[in-house]
Amino acid sequence: PYPRNVFSCGQAKQGVSLFHTNFTNRIDKTSYILNYGQTPLVKSRYLKYVTKEKHPYGENAIVAIMCYSGYNVEDAVIINRASLERGLFRTTYFNMYEAHEEKQNIGNAKVDTVFMDIMRNNVIGLKPDYDYSHLDKKTGLIKENTYVNTKTVVIGKATRSIIEKDVYIDASKTTKKGQIGYVDKAF
């Protein structure tokens, strides 16, 4: 049934593991990577043909079921803090930002949206309190290995004003709210 397939695909997209061995060379919209994946302790016979038993996925967590301090804790999980601090279940979230240059005809006027150096004098409408300093002067893209937060512009883009031909209006792309990290690739 169709709704069940959609639900199943949605659940699979949320799975955290090493979904592909060339994830560093791929550009996916979003991906979750388990940093310290392990090969499973219990394996199926089919696994040795598919992955040669070298493809890590999941974590081998040791679980003990018992009463804690005399009370029955049925709906709780107690995890060792030292294990978490050493990296148990640590994941990396990759997110892609994309933009396009466009040429549009609006009435008799041609409107161009282009990647550019936003810090030029003829660009108006800059976003207040946003950091444009990490953008490349030639391409308008953020430089690789740059730390980004919610106030960082990742793609410098501007639209030519219809009224004044030499004036551009800022249309830059920023990170989503709450996302912090480092730029992996920019092209």
Outline where the language-model segments fall.
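Conduit-forming functional cores of very large proteins
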Residues: 1-187
